[in-house]
Amino acid sequence: IWGALVMKALEEKIVKEGVWLPGNILKVGSFLNHQIDGKFMMELGEEIARLFAQEKIDRILTIETSGIPLAMAASVALGVPMVFAKKNRTSNLSGGLYQTAVHSYTHNTDYTVVVEKQYLPAGERVLLVDDFLANGKALMGLMELVNQAGSQTVGAVAAIEKGFQKGGDLLRSQGLRVEALALIDSMDNGNL
């Protein structure tokens, strides 16, 4: 029952505070990925921990920047480390890197995301976490990083899945367990 209440609260926040933008963009910056409702974010993290309670998870992986708050909340709830893939190779990165190309639907931009090898060890079971799941490119890129590391992706979770954009279907067709805390079936003329 608790999980259903958290997901219902997320749906209510999306309807009340979400702003529809042209191009099927949903702006939820008031609570999810710009300004953070910390208490609510921790509740979402607890729900992720509940959903994946039967899985052995060694690490959480996300992409900067918008996935970090949710991934951090899940990290705390699961008691495992969280690492984020950087969208830019900075001068303070040392040692070997895993890297892959990712296309951002929201920004319509291609990034080469990187993770230092020391933060994504071989042989681990990794949960992918992101704020949105639209076309699935970000999560597929994260899966590629996990594969490069010689680890296993045990699942993926997004706060919000845009079901009409088929990224979730694509990932599920590859045998990946994908969970969404909220599912949007359509965004016709600003109506969710």
Features from the language model and the residues they span:
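PRPP-associated nucleotide enzymes
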Residues: 1-129, 133-192
